[in-house]
Swiss-Prot record:
<protein>
    <recommendedName>
        <fullName>GTPase Obg</fullName>
        <ecNumber>3.6.5.-</ecNumber>
    </recommendedName>
</protein>
<keyword id="KW-0479">Metal-binding</keyword>
<feature type="binding site">
    <location>
        <begin position="312"/>
        <end position="314"/>
    </location>
    <ligand>
        <name>GTP</name>
    </ligand>
</feature>
<dbReference type="InterPro" id="IPR006074">
    <property type="entry name" value="GTP1-OBG_CS"/>
</dbReference>
<keyword id="KW-0460">Magnesium</keyword>
<comment type="similarity">
    <text>Belongs to the TRAFAC class OBG-HflX-like GTPase superfamily. OBG GTPase family.</text>
</comment>
<dbReference type="Pfam" id="PF09269">
    <property type="entry name" value="DUF1967"/>
</dbReference>
<keyword id="KW-0963">Cytoplasm</keyword>
<dbReference type="GO" id="GO:0000287">
    <property type="term" value="F:magnesium ion binding"/>
</dbReference>
<dbReference type="InterPro" id="IPR027417">
    <property type="entry name" value="P-loop_NTPase"/>
</dbReference>
<feature type="binding site">
    <location>
        <begin position="212"/>
        <end position="215"/>
    </location>
    <ligand>
        <name>GTP</name>
    </ligand>
</feature>
<dbReference type="InterPro" id="IPR014100">
    <property type="entry name" value="GTP-bd_Obg/CgtA"/>
</dbReference>
<dbReference type="InterPro" id="IPR015349">
    <property type="entry name" value="OCT_dom"/>
</dbReference>
<feature type="binding site">
    <location>
        <begin position="190"/>
        <end position="194"/>
    </location>
    <ligand>
        <name>GTP</name>
    </ligand>
</feature>
<dbReference type="InterPro" id="IPR036726">
    <property type="entry name" value="GTP1_OBG_dom_sf"/>
</dbReference>
<feature type="binding site">
    <location>
        <position position="192"/>
    </location>
    <ligand>
        <name>Mg(2+)</name>
    </ligand>
</feature>
<dbReference type="InterPro" id="IPR006073">
    <property type="entry name" value="GTP-bd"/>
</dbReference>
C-alpha cells in the first residue's frame, strides 16, 4: 500500500539530574562535595532509508520515545547518556511541525538525517558549584526537560520527469513503454491510484527517473478528485511531460485539457507552473484528421511551448524522440534542493534561558522555563544558595530588565511561589 502522509508523536529523553553528595570516608574529615553530573537524554533522529518507498510503517506505530539520561551519583559518578532513537523514513520525506505546519527538514539525500527532538542536557552535580567562598554547596541542577511534539511527514517522490495530464490519456501506458514499470492499465478513469516510478535508459545518455502522477483534474488544486494528494509529487521534478489525448475519443477538446491542467498547476504552485514542459499529443494512432494536431500545436506554441510531440504510446510511435528530448532538457537543468521560504521554515526556539516579566500592581512576576529550572536547583532557605540564586538572576539579565521596567526598593519580585523584596 502506498502511503505518502503520516502524523507521529516524538519525545526525546530527559536529562539526568545532578547529584547532591559529599565524600564520606574513614580518616577523611572534610571530604567535600562529590556529586556527579546527570547523563544527556537521547535524541529522536529521522534518518533516510533508500530502501523505503512509503510511510506505511507509521500507520501501525505513531508514538516514539528516546531513552532518558541516568542520574548522577556520589564519588563524581556521571549518569549514563540515553540512547538516541533512530526512525527510518523514505528518501524525499518532508518533515513539518504539526502545530505550526512549518517545514523542519527536507530529507532528500541518502545520507540525510535530522534531530527532530533533542535530548535534555544532564544537570550539574554539586561538585560543580564549589568556589573559594562556597565550599559545601548543597544543591545541584536537575536535568533539562525532554522535547516532545507531533510532527507531520509528507513524502514527495524523487523523480526527474513527471507525467501529468487528465485521467485516461495514456500516462501509465507511456510509463510502461519507456521503462520496466508495470502500472495498472485499464480503460477507465482513476485506474492509477498511486504515483508510479520507472527508470528510462537511453543509450549514450545517463538514466533518469520518470513518475506517472495520477488524479490531476479540473479543481485538483482545491481538493477535487485525488489532485491534492498527488500534486506534491510533481514539486521535485525538473521537467514535466504533459500528456494530451489528441484523438478526443472521450469527447474532450485537447486544447481545453491543456489549459485546464496548466491552470491547476498555476493555482497550486506558481513555480511548478513555470517548470519546463514538453507536450506529448498521445493516441495519434486514433487520430484521423491530421489538421487537428497541427491546429493544436499552433495554439500551444502561442503560449511559449515549442516542444510538441505527436506520439502513440500504444504503437510506440514518436516515443523515443520524446524521451531523448526529455533527457536533453534534463542535462541543461541543475539538480537543486527543494526551496523552503523563510515564511515556511520552522525556527527552533531556545528554551533553556527563556523568561518573561510582567507587572501586576507593585509585584513583578518572572515566568518561564529558566525560572522553573533555577528554582528546582537551589534551596531558597540556605544563604549560600540564595547568593548563587541572586548571581544567576544578575548574569542572565533579569535584574537589569527589572530596573529598566522601573522597579523600586521594596517592590515584590515573584518567581513561581517564591517572593522577595527588591533592594538596589
Amino acid at each position: 500500500m502506498f502511503i505518502d502522509t503520516a502524523k507521529i508523536f516524538v519525545k526525546s529523553g530527559k536529562g539526568g539530574d545532578g547529584s547532591i553528595s559529599f565524600r564520606r570516608e574513614k580518616y577523611i574529615a572534610f571530604g567535600g562535595p562529590d556529586g556527579g553530573d546527570g547523563g544527556k537524554g537521547g535524541n529522536v533522529v529521522l534518518v533516510v532509508d533508500p530502501n523505503m518507498t512509503t510511510l506505511l510503517d507509521f500507520t501501525y506505530k505513531r508514538k516514539y520515545k528516546a531513552e532518558p539520561g541516568g542520574n548522577g551519583a556520589g564519588s563524581k559518578c556521571f549518569g549514563k547518556n540515553g540512547k538516541d532513537l533512530h526512525i527510518k523514513v523514505p528518501m524525499g520525506t518532508i518533515v513539518k511541525d504539526a502545530e505550526t505546519d512549518k517545514i523542519m527538514a527536507d530529507l532528500s539525500k541518502p545520507e540525510d538525517s535530522y534531530v527532530v527532538a533533542k535530548g535534555g542536557r544532564g544537570g550539574k552535580g554539586n561538585c560543580r558549584f564549589t568556589t573559594p567562598t562556597r565550599q559545601a554547596p548543597d544543591f545541584a541542577e536537575p536535568g533539562m526537560p525532554e522535547e516532545e511534539r507531533w510532527i507531520k511527514l509528507e513524502l514527495k517522490l524523487l523523480a526527474d520527469v513527471g507525467l501529468i495530464g487528465f485521467p485516461n490519456v495514456g500516462k501509465s501506458t507511456l510509463l510502461s513503454v519507456v521503462s520496466k514499470a508495470r502500472p495498472k492499465i485499464a480503460n477507465y478513469h482513476f485506474t492509477t491510484l498511486k504515483p508510479n516510478l520507472g527508470v528510462v535508459s537511453i543509450e549514450g545518455v545517463s538514466n533518469f527517473v520518470i513518475a506517472d502522477i495520477p488524479g490531476i483534474i479540473e479543481g485538483a488544486s482545491e481538493g477535487v478528485g485525488l489532485g491534492l494528494d498527488f500534486l506534491r509529487h510533481v514539486e521535485r521534478t525538473r521537467v514535466l511531460i504533459h500528456v494530451i489525448d489528441i484523438s478526443s475519443v472521450e469527447g474532450r477538446d485537447p486544447y481545453d485539457d491543456f489549459l485546464k491542467i496548466n491552470e491547476e498547476l498555476k493555482r497550486y504552485n506558481v513555480k511548478l507552473y513555470g517548470r519546463p514542459q514538453i507536450i506529448a499529443a498521445n493516441k495519434s494512432d486514433m487520430l484521423f484528421d491530421e489538421e487537428k494536431f497541427e491546429e493544436f500545436k499552433t495554439k500551444v506554441e502561442k503560449h511559449g511551448y515549442n516542444k510538441v510531440f505527436k506520439i502513440s504510446a500504444a504503437t510506440k510511435q514518436g516515443v523515443d524522440d520524446l524521451m531523448k528530448e526529455a533527457a536533453r532538457l534534463l542535462s541543461t537543468i541543475p539538480v537543486t534542493d527543494l526551496e523552503i521560504s523563510e515564511e515556511d521554515r520552522f525556527i527552533e526556539e531556545e528554551k533553556r534561558f527563556t523568561y518573561s516579566i510582567r507587572k501586576e500592581d507593585n509585584t513583578y512576576i518572572v515566568e518561564g522555563s529558566f525560572v522553573d529550572r533555577l528554582l528546582n536547583a537551589v534551596n531558597v532557605n540556605d544563604p549560600d544558595d540564595l547568593r548563587y540564586f541572586h548571581k544567576v538572576l544578575k548574569n542572565k539579565g533579569v535584574m537589569e530588565e527589572l530596573m529598566e521596567m522601573g522597579i523600586e526598593d521594596g517592590d515584590v519580585v515573584r518567581l513561581n511561589d517564591f517572593e522577595f523584596d527588591f533592594l538596589l
